[in-house]
C-alpha cells in the first residue's frame, strides 16, 4: 500500500453561495462545486464527478468511465453545458471504474484535473497516484455514508412497477420547496413525475437510519476535520439562524472548508464569483455531526 495521504485541518469554515443565482438553485447547496469545475474546464482541464446513469448524455463530450450501475464516476473534459448531471447529491455508492488511471494519465500529460468524491475515494486516489501533482485539485464531501447500489436499484424497480414506466432522472434534493426542505423528484419515461419530501420516502428514511450503508461506513476514519482533499463541501446545516445574509438563504448555502495552500490560492482566485461569511469551525461541525 502507498503511504497515507497528507491530511489538512482548516482554521475556519465558510458559509458560501455562488453569485450566479441560476447555478446556485440548480445545485444541492450553494453551488461552489460548479465554480471549481468551471475554473478547471476554463484551463483546458478535466473534471471527475458522479453522474447517475439515468442522466448520462449520449454525446461524446462526457467520457463515461463505467456504465451499467446506478451511479458512475464520469470524466467531463469538454463542454461546460454538460456540467449539470454532476451537480446535486447522489445518495448511492458510485462506481469508480478506471477513473484513477484516467486521472493519472491526464496529470502525466500536464492536464489540470479536478477530482471530486467522498473522502475515502479522494484518499484512495492520492495513494494510487503516489506523488503530488501541482495541477491536481481535489474536493471531498461531508458524507453520511454510501447506500448499497443493490438497494437503490430495488427501490427504483419498485417505483417503476408502480408507475408502469422506466425512471429517466432522479434528483435527491430538488429545491422547489426550498433548500431547507429538500424534495425527491423522480421523472419517468412516460413524462410522469413523482415528488415527495425525501426524508418521508422509504429510501430517505432508510438512509437516515443507516439501514443499508456499506459496512465500511460503520468504521469510517474520515469523520473529522482532518481531510485529505483541498476542499471539503457540504450543506451548511447549523448556520446561525440569526445571521443576516445578503442573499435568500433558502436558495442554498454551502459549507466550505479550505484545507490546503493550493485550495487557498484557488479560493482567492474564485472569490469575485461568490459571496461568503467566515464562520467558526465548531459551528460547521455541530451542524454536520
List where the protein language model places each region.
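Iron-sulfur-associated redox domains of electron-transfer enzymes in respiratory
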Residues: 2-289
Amino acid at each position: 500500500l502507498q503511504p497515507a495521504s497528507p491530511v489538512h485541518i482548516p482554521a475556519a469554515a465558510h458559509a458560501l453561495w455562488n453569485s450566479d443565482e441560476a447555478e446556485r438553485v440548480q445545485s444541492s447547496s450553494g453551488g461552489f462545486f460548479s465554480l471549481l469545475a468551471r475554473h478547471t474546464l476554463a484551463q483546458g482541464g478535466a473534471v471527475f464527478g458522479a453522474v447517475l446513469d439515468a442522466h448520462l448524455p449520449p454525446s461524446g463530450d462526457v467520457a463515461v468511465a463505467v456504465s451499467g450501475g446506478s451511479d458512475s464516476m464520469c470524466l467531463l473534459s469538454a463542454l461546460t453545458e454538460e456540467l449539470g448531471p454532476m451537480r446535486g447529491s447522489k445518495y448511492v455508492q458510485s462506481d469508480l471504474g478506471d477513473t484513477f488511471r484516467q486521472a493519472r494519465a491526464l496529470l502525466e500529460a500536464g492536464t489540470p484535473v479536478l477530482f471530486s468524491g467522498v473522502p475515502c475515494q479522494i484518499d484512495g486516489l492520492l495513494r494510487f497516484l503516489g506523488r503530488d501533482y501541482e495541477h491536481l485539485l481535489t474536493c471531498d464531501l461531508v458524507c453520511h455514508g454510501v447506500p448499497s447500489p443493490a438497494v437503490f436499484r430495488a427501490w427504483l424497480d419498485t417505483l417503476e412497477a408502480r408507475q408502469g414506466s422506466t425512471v429517466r432522472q432522479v434528483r435527491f434534493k430538488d429545491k422547489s420547496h426550498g433548500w431547507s426542505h429538500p424534495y425527491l423528484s423522480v421523472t419517468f419515461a412516460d413524462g410522469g413525475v413523482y415528488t415527495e419530501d425525501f426524508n418521508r420516502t422509504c429510501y430517505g428514511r432508510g438512509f437516515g437510519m443507516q439501514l443499508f450503508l456499506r459496512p465500511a461506513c460503520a468504521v469510517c476514519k474520515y469523520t473529522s476535520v482532518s481531510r485529505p482533499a483541498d476542499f471539503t463541501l457540504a450543506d451548511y446545516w447549523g448556520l446561525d439562524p440569526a445571521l443576516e445574509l445578503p442573499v435568500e438563504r433558502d436558495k442554498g448555502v454551502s459549507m466550505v472548508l479550505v484545507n490546503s495552500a493550493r485550495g487557498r490560492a484557488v479560493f482567492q482566485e474564485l472569490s469575485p464569483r461568490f459571496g461568503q461569511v467566515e464562520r467558526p469551525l465548531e459551528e460547521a461541525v455541530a451542524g454536520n455531526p
